[in-house]
Swiss-Prot record:
Reactions listed under catalytic activity: a ubiquinone + n Na(+)(in) + NADH + H(+) = a ubiquinol + n Na(+)(out) + NAD(+)
Localisation per UniProt entry: Cell inner membrane
Protein name: Na(+)-translocating NADH-quinone reductase subunit C
Signal peptide segment: none
UniProt source species: Vibrio campbellii (strain ATCC BAA-1116)
Membrane topology: Single-pass membrane protein
Length: 261
């Protein structure tokens, strides 16, 4: 009988030991996978910034191009001025605007009238990306986001140094319907933005997503997405908010006045 008990104890010991080893392996793998996912997300974002900046990536790795041509800077949304650190002490190199927007100490809750992009909260500090060639700044890239039909849509908009002319746009995260709202990623649709003016003569946000098609030669109009009116409305709200006084409006006003020089 004692022999049977010893056998059972040994079996249980082996099972427990294997379980512990397996749990350690799984935990280690999960941590490694999470780190890899974070690294991939950073690389993807850098790739999109390099793309919308119009930088020729041939023959060089994205991190090298990003380090050479892109300078992240922090901006105080209220004043439009550059700042060295965010409220949590982060610098442009490690600032997480999404995380800040969720923290009541580092963000503001938007009223229904203010919240044209349907994002609920806005961080007090934003990040922009200066496109540089040596000491010269050729463009500025602003990150924008707004709610579509099914998802929050995140994009980068490249703006010339006049603070008004679009040189490119790319969506890097969205979950809209493939073939409909998901066409925000279509290069043909995105190409319509190039050369458009963000503001009218009174410096008010002027980009218009036009259902049925923008008039030919329109300075501000972009064709709506066929069969995706609500996604188009989300794109419209995104531009209305982020070009306005609660978004990058004050910063872009300073860019127009030569604030990058």
């Amino acid at each position: 009988m004692a022999s049977n008990n010893d056998s059972i104890k040994k079996t249980l010991g082996v099972v427990v030991g294997l379980s512990l080893v397996c749990s350690i392996i799984v935990s280690t793998a999960a941590v490694g996978l999470r780190d890899q996912q974070k690294a991939n997300a950073v690389l993807d974002k850098q790739s999109k910034i390099v793309e919308v900046a119009g930088i020729d990536a041939e023959g060089k790795k994205v991190p090298e191009l990003f380090a050479e041509y892109i300078e992240p800077r922090l901006v105080d949304f209220k004043t439009g001025d550059f700042v060295e650190k965010a409220e949590d002490g982060s610098t442009a190199a490690n600032y997480d605007q999404r995380k800040a927007a969720k923290d009541p100490a580092e963000s503001i809750k938007l009223t229904a009238d203010e919240d044209k992009a349907k994002i609920l909260r806005r961080a007090n500090t934003g990040i922009v990306y200066l496109v540089k060639n040596g000491d010269d700044i050729s463009k500025v890239i602003i990150p924008v986001h707004g709610n579509g039909l099914w998802s929050m849509m995140y994009a980068f908009v490249a703006v010339e140094t006049d603070g008004n002319t679009v040189s490119g746009i790319t969506y890097y995260e969205q979950g809209e319907t493939p073939g409909l709202g998901g066409e925000v990623e279509n290069p043909v649709w995105r190409a319509q933005f190039v050369g458009k003016k963000l503001f009218d003569e009174n410096h008010k946000p002027a980009i218009k997503i036009v259902k049925g098609g923008a008039p030919e030669g329109s300075e501000h109009g972009v064709d709506g997405l066929s069969g995706a009116t609500l996604t188009g409305n989300g794109v419209q709200g995104t531009f209305d908010f982020w070009l306005g006084d609660m978004g990058f409006g004050p910063f872009l006003a300073k860019v127009r006045d030569g604030g990058l020089n």
